[in-house]
Swiss-Prot record:
Catalytic activity annotation: 5-methylsulfanyl-2,3-dioxopentyl phosphate + H2O = 1,2-dihydroxy-5-(methylsulfanyl)pent-1-en-3-one + phosphate
Enzyme Commission number(s) from the entry: 3.1.3.77
Species of origin: Debaryomyces hansenii (strain ATCC 36239 / CBS 767 / BCRC 21394 / JCM 1990 / NBRC 0083 / IGC 2968)
Keywords: Amino-acid biosynthesis, Cytoplasm, Hydrolase, Magnesium, Metal-binding, Methionine biosynthesis, Nucleus
Localisation per UniProt entry: Cytoplasm; Nucleus
Name this protein carries in UniProt: Enolase-phosphatase E1
Lineage, top ranks: Eukaryota, Fungi, Dikarya, Ascomycota, Saccharomycotina
Cofactor binding, per record: Binds 1 Mg(2+) ion per subunit.
Amino acid sequence: MPISFAAPIEVIVLDIEGTVCPISFVKTTLFPYFLEKLPSELSALTYPLKSTSNSPVEEICSQFPENVRVSSDSLLEYTTSLVNNDIKDPILKSLQGFIWKLGYENGELMAPVYEDAIEFVTDLSKTRKIYIYSSGSIKAQVLLFGHVKGANGSPVDMNRYLSGYYDITTAGFKQESGSYVSILKDIGYESKQSSVLFLSDNVREVDAAIQAGMNSLVVDRPGNAPLSEADKKSFSIIETFRDLKL
């Protein structure tokens, strides 16, 4: 049965991985691509790194701790550790975004956004504002939605349907209710919280959004982390955006 809401939903905020595209895309495609390309990018730099370099990679990497900037080996070990431990480091996110940009632009990467998510964003953008909130950098978000795999296998740019983007540097960490309060203030809905709907696969993020006054649902896609019985009782859950009645 489609899920409806007591108050009209005027704004939708979407998570990315596990919500609009398979959670496996990041872990089995984007992360490995980054780690595959990283060694050659780091070995091309001159050490010790300088923040005033004309190289975008060197400029980003110069923000990492001084003790890991002494050689390509130490920097590779450090960044690889951040990736493998899924550390939400803003500098790492910037570096990943730059390398993914190269991959998207040369056609090696395309985002497998769910068909129902493409329909949802395309149709709802005509009458509502749609924002993205992800732990990935805003640049990475724009790249992903700018290179969505279309029905014919060619990349499609969906950014024209989106009203804005948030990441951990602009809104805060996604499991903290204050981050959603910041978004509400930024979009002018701090007094109309229930008119905003946040969709995510992560129950802690959904709980944080609810604490901030938003409507929020858990998206249960194939491959996502299994939901506990307690979660199933505590949260409203959808398996596809077609389950929503807005």
